[in-house]
Amino acid sequence: AESAQNILPAADAAAYNRGKKRRSLAFRICMHVLMVLIGLILVFPYVLMISKSLMTTEEIIGAELILFPAVPQFSNYLQVLQDNNYLSALGNTMFVIIFNLIAVPLSATFIAFGFARCKFWGKNVLFGFMLSTMMLPAVVTQIPLYSLYNTFGWLNTLLPLTIPNITGGGAIYIFLARSFLQSLPKDIDDAAKIDGAGPLRRYFFIGLPLCKPIIVYIMVNVFTSNWGDYYGPLIWRLDDSFPDTFAYAVFYSFTDQNVGSDTLNIRMAAGVLMS
């Protein structure tokens, strides 16, 4: 009798565990299906853009809905690179990117080195003030910056997209570089001071070479933010004499009412290159 009583609870527990496993498996399957559906929904617009970029004009503007081209037209991408408007805009973008790829990591690590490895009066107060700028939405500073750049004569040029970045490119990069530099042993500075190295020499020969990981991170972020930036050129642009960037040229080609639908495949190809 006692063995039978022991067997029944064990059987119930086993049945409960099997049911729990089945419910858990069903839940996981449902979650995976849901995530796949969400992923497909998110990827579909980009896949459609790539598909449209490989179509002929007739396939795009035709009455019949076509999702994929009969014969991929890779020549559409060559037409983008042969278009003078896109080509000059691409050159302007590369100039902005190369300038900022050099200026932002150097200036951010240089400023961060002062906060992390040097001693001067009011350092913590100044650093806290700098961090407080991170709480300001970018739109709050647009009107003051517009007025300032107008006074300098920078509007309708690429200067607003480059020169301000020699101050670190934003408090977040300085904060990250400072945190990285603070993690380095202080003995390195002490040894350099004994050898007679000043702050500048310690930065260029010790701090900067050791900052390679954070520099790579900053450069990746600088590249992606500048490559896809059309908001900045949109603000500082006054007329058609502005040296358009590639992202703005693509944006303008989709919003300009004077551009016909017969070039939609070329514009889609430009959008793929920009993305």
Residue positions per predicted region:
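A structural signal for multi-pass alpha-helical bundles of membrane permease subunits
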Residues: 27-275
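Transmembrane alpha-helical segments of polytopic membrane transport and secretion proteins
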Residues: 1-36
